[in-house]
From Swiss-Prot:
Required for transport of secretory proteins from the Golgi complex. Catalyzes the transfer of phosphatidylinositol and phosphatidylcholine between membranes in vitro. The gene is SFH12. GO terms for biological process: protein transport. Specifically expressed in flowers. This is Phosphatidylinositol/phosphatidylcholine transfer protein SFH12. The keyword Cell membrane applies. It is found in: Golgi apparatus membrane; Cell membrane. It comes from Arabidopsis thaliana (Mouse-ear cress).
Length: 543
């Protein structure tokens, strides 16, 4: 009881682990919340992993001590995403968090939704078809990109790189502030990841010129540094045999956790997509039944729970905030008063092994956040993700585009050009030498037969050398393309003179041909006249 009294007398002091050590205190606080106004609304499922809970709490305490935790970002799931992005390394995560706060201040990410007006959105979507459309069967928003229809040259003519980056950040902020909360309410559980579909049919070097690569590089840095761990799974559809072969090579440069989320499919992808996404939520051109005829087509409709006025009303009321799985019970712990000389120390090894861990219930009390996005995460809902924390890695997401995989596609396209004439047997042996997700029966059969074969190793230096050479060749093509298409006046004059002379010669040839025809006609008449005279002469001699 002494510990409880101390916690009540000093609600803003002491570590969370000390205050959470009392089982009775936890249950009493839970009861008070049940009678609160927040609990009067529909509960959103929130189950926290005990190990992740401790890691986030330690990270949160460290941020509080260094005054690096703004009230808006005092969010359990946001901190967990950053921890996963740095493999739960506290110092590296803290550095990443600090850089994120600095970037948001310099870029103006907190006000971009109100201040930025992207008037050229219709033209941009015309040359870069992309957008959210519906949700999958687990409630996550579905993001679609048709990379084969991207025209990066015309895209950069209707907008600038800086404006597109602003639009990209604005869409990311809208996703976290509007779309994820709406999906959380609709699914009755925490949602902060997306399902992505990349259609690579028709993808070539024309889709990824230097301007496109520069744009992808900037977007990839923004996403990876400031919006990590937002990709749940990705389907790359209409991938040819060359693409699938080179995917085996390129994925050796990626983290296994990332590759586990990426499924490369051929042109028979419809059944697999329908396993994950309901037919009514999938566009007709991807095998679904939705056309969004009244909204300008599926790629422009932005269909989803965020279009429902009732759901959006609940979002504005804060109903998407999690109601279970708390670490900190006292909102006063978010900031440290100036008169508080005590420091919050992380739990010792003895505390970690003590009974305090055992009394943590499966669903913890509510994570105490202000008006930030309080989502709840259920471990069983994560699809194709390795659950061990040690396997976590840095990963950027893409709201209108997951740029890390776009960079991968760009590299694969380049390699396709280089290995265009590889013999078929060599191609197949490389393609099926290691397991890669594919729904084609023939592909799976060949993969099983070649399971014991190994992929030829390609060093990073060789890969970069190929990319550098292709960049040089593309630069030369760009220079040639930049040359004026209008012929110089002197050469044009020479060409016109040659054409004029050719016309004269053609006329002379026609006149000569006519004269020759006339001569042949007269010759035939003379021959006929001579033959006639000969016959008359013979007849005269006969008589």
């Amino acid at each position: 009881m002494t510990l409880i009294q101390d916690a009540e007398l000093k609600p803003r002091m002491g570590s969370f682990k000390k205050r959470s050590s009392s089982k009775n205190l936890r249950y009493s606080m839970t009861k008070r919340r049940r009678s609160s106004k927040v609990m009067s609304v529909e509960i959103i499922e929130d189950v926290h992993d005990a190990e992740e809970l401790k890691a986030v709490d330690a990270f949160r305490q460290s941020l509080i001590l260094d005054e690096l935790l703004p009230e808006k970002h005092d969010d359990y799931h946001m901190m967990l995403r950053f921890l996963k992005a740095r493999k739960f390394d506290l110092e590296k995560t803290k550095q990443m968090w600090t850089e994120m706060l600095r970037w948001r201040k310099e870029f103006g990410a907190d006000t971009v939704m109100e201040e930025f007006d992207f008037k050229e959105i219709d033209e941009v979507l015309k040359y870069y078809p992309q957008g959210h459309h519906g949700v999958d069967k687990e409630g996550r928003p579905v993001y679609i990109e048709r990379l084969g229809l991207v025209d990066s040259t015309k895209l950069m003519q209707v907008t600038t790189m800086d404006r597109y980056v602003n639009y990209h950040v604005m869409e990311f902020e809208r996703t976290f502030n509007v779309k994820f909360p709406a999906c959380s309410i609709a699914a009755k559980k925490h949602i902060d990841q997306s399902t992505t579909i990349l259609d690579v049919q028709g993808v070539g070097l024309k889709n990824f010129n230097k301007a496109a690569r520069d744009l992808i590089t900037r977007l990839q840095k923004v996403d990876g540094d400031n919006y990590p761990e937002t990709l749940n799974r990705m389907f790359i559809i209409n991938a040819g045999s060359g693409f699938r072969m080179l995917w085996n090579t390129v994925k050796s440069f990626l983290d296994p956790k990332t590759t586990a989320k990426i499924h490369v499919l051929g042109n028979k992808y419809q059944s697999k997509l329908l396993e994950i996404i309901d037919e009514s939520e999938l566009p007709e051109f991807l095998g679904g039944s939705c056309t969004c005829a009244d909204n300008g087509g599926c790629m422009r409709s932005d269909k989803g729970p965020w279009k429902n006025p009732e759901i959006m009303k609940r979002v504005h009321n804060g109903d998407h905030k999690c109601s279970k799985g708390s670490q900190a019970e006292n909102s006063g712990e978010k900031t440290i008063p100036e008169e508080d000389d005590s420091t919050t120390e992380p739990a010792s090894e003895e505390e970690k092994a003590s009974k305090e861990v055992e009394i943590v219930p499966a669903a913890h009390p509510a994570w105490n956040m202000p008006e930030a996005h309080k989502f709840s995460l259920s471990k069983k809902e994560v699809y194709a993700i390795q659950e061990a924390c040690n396997n976590a890695t840095t990963e950027g997401g893409r709201s209108p585009i997951f740029t890390g995989v776009m960079a991968l596609v760009m590299g694969v396209v380049t390699m396709i050009k280089v290995t265009k004439n590889v013999p078929r047997k060599l191609t197949e042996s490389t393609l099926y030498s290691s397991p890669v997700y594919c729904d084609d029966a023939s592909m799976n059969k060949s993969a099983m037969q070649s399971e014991k074969m190994t992929v030829p190793a390609i060093s990073g230096e060789d890969f970069m050398a190929i990319m550098k050479r292709m960049a040089e060749l593309e630069q030369k093509v760009t220079v040639l393309s930049a040359q004026p298409t209008v012929m110089p006046p002197d050469k044009e004059e020479m060409l016109n003179a040659a054409i004029s002379r050719s016309n004269v010669l053609e006329q002379e040839l026609a006149a000569t041909k006519k004269a020759l025809d006339d001569s042949l006609g007269r010759q035939e008449e003379l021959v006929a006249y001579i033959e006639k005279k000969k016959k008359k002469k013979k007849l005269f001699n006969y008589w």
